[in-house]
Amino acid sequence: MASKKAAMVMMAMIVIMAMLVDTSVAIDLCGMSQDELNECKPAVSKENPTSPSQPCCTALQHADFACLCGYKNSPWLGSFGVDPELASALPKQCGLANAPTC
């Protein structure tokens, strides 16, 4: 249990560092690249969310939903301005038939 928590904290730190440093650092989280995650950010933002873009919906087609659902209750989402409820609704908004319920 402790090692799983430590791994999640480490992954969150990597994501934070990648978002803070505007470089060509390649990051892959739950089958989505940093660029793909950024495509979806406007649709899951706490302030002024938008409808998901076509590039966001395309990226979600190959995402690992079980992995993404694992972050739903993560306190790190709030620090990125991500609303977990909006994020959970995103696959349905994109019309993805294989979208799980987190």
Swiss-Prot record:
<dbReference type="GO" id="GO:0048046">
    <property type="term" value="C:apoplast"/>
</dbReference>
<keyword id="KW-0964">Secreted</keyword>
<dbReference type="Pfam" id="PF14368">
    <property type="entry name" value="LTP_2"/>
</dbReference>
<keyword id="KW-0732">Signal</keyword>
<protein>
    <recommendedName>
        <fullName>Putative lipid-transfer protein DIR1</fullName>
    </recommendedName>
</protein>
<feature type="disulfide bond">
    <location>
        <begin position="30"/>
        <end position="67"/>
    </location>
</feature>
<keyword id="KW-0813">Transport</keyword>
<keyword id="KW-0611">Plant defense</keyword>
<feature type="disulfide bond">
    <location>
        <begin position="69"/>
        <end position="102"/>
    </location>
</feature>
<dbReference type="InterPro" id="IPR044741">
    <property type="entry name" value="NsLTP-like"/>
</dbReference>
<dbReference type="InterPro" id="IPR016140">
    <property type="entry name" value="Bifunc_inhib/LTP/seed_store"/>
</dbReference>
<comment type="similarity">
    <text>Belongs to the A9/FIL1 family.</text>
</comment>
<keyword id="KW-0862">Zinc</keyword>
<dbReference type="InterPro" id="IPR039265">
    <property type="entry name" value="DIR1-like"/>
</dbReference>
<feature type="disulfide bond">
    <location>
        <begin position="40"/>
        <end position="56"/>
    </location>
</feature>
<dbReference type="GO" id="GO:0008270">
    <property type="term" value="F:zinc ion binding"/>
</dbReference>
<keyword id="KW-0052">Apoplast</keyword>
<feature type="binding site">
    <location>
        <position position="34"/>
    </location>
    <ligand>
        <name>a 1-acyl-sn-glycero-3-phosphocholine</name>
    </ligand>
</feature>
<keyword id="KW-0256">Endoplasmic reticulum</keyword>
<dbReference type="InterPro" id="IPR036312">
    <property type="entry name" value="Bifun_inhib/LTP/seed_sf"/>
</dbReference>
<keyword id="KW-0965">Cell junction</keyword>
<dbReference type="GO" id="GO:0099503">
    <property type="term" value="C:secretory vesicle"/>
</dbReference>
<dbReference type="GO" id="GO:0009627">
    <property type="term" value="P:systemic acquired resistance"/>
</dbReference>
<feature type="binding site">
    <location>
        <position position="36"/>
    </location>
    <ligand>
        <name>Zn(2+)</name>
    </ligand>
</feature>
<feature type="disulfide bond">
    <location>
        <begin position="57"/>
        <end position="94"/>
    </location>
</feature>
<dbReference type="GO" id="GO:0005783">
    <property type="term" value="C:endoplasmic reticulum"/>
</dbReference>
<feature type="signal peptide">
    <location>
        <begin position="1"/>
        <end position="25"/>
    </location>
</feature>
<comment type="subunit">
    <text>Self-interacts and binds to AZI1. Does not interact with PDLP1.</text>
</comment>
<feature type="binding site">
    <location>
        <position position="38"/>
    </location>
    <ligand>
        <name>a 1-acyl-sn-glycero-3-phosphocholine</name>
    </ligand>
</feature>
<keyword id="KW-0445">Lipid transport</keyword>
<feature type="binding site">
    <location>
        <position position="62"/>
    </location>
    <ligand>
        <name>Zn(2+)</name>
    </ligand>
</feature>
<keyword id="KW-0479">Metal-binding</keyword>
<dbReference type="GO" id="GO:0009506">
    <property type="term" value="C:plasmodesma"/>
</dbReference>
<keyword id="KW-1015">Disulfide bond</keyword>
<keyword id="KW-0446">Lipid-binding</keyword>
<dbReference type="GO" id="GO:0006869">
    <property type="term" value="P:lipid transport"/>
</dbReference>
<dbReference type="GO" id="GO:0009862">
    <property type="term" value="P:systemic acquired resistance, salicylic acid mediated signaling pathway"/>
</dbReference>
<dbReference type="GO" id="GO:0005504">
    <property type="term" value="F:fatty acid binding"/>
</dbReference>
<comment type="function">
    <text>Putative lipid transfer protein required for systemic acquired resistance (SAR) long distance signaling. May interact with a lipid-derived molecule to promote long distance signaling associated with SAR. Together with AZI1, required for glycerol-3-phosphate- (G3P) and azelaic acid- (AA) induced systemic acquired resistance (SAR). Component of plant systemic immunity involved in priming defenses in a AA-dependent manner, by modulating production and/or translocation of a mobile signal(s) during SAR. Is able to bind with high affinity monoacylated phospholipids, mainly lysophosphatidylcholines.</text>
</comment>
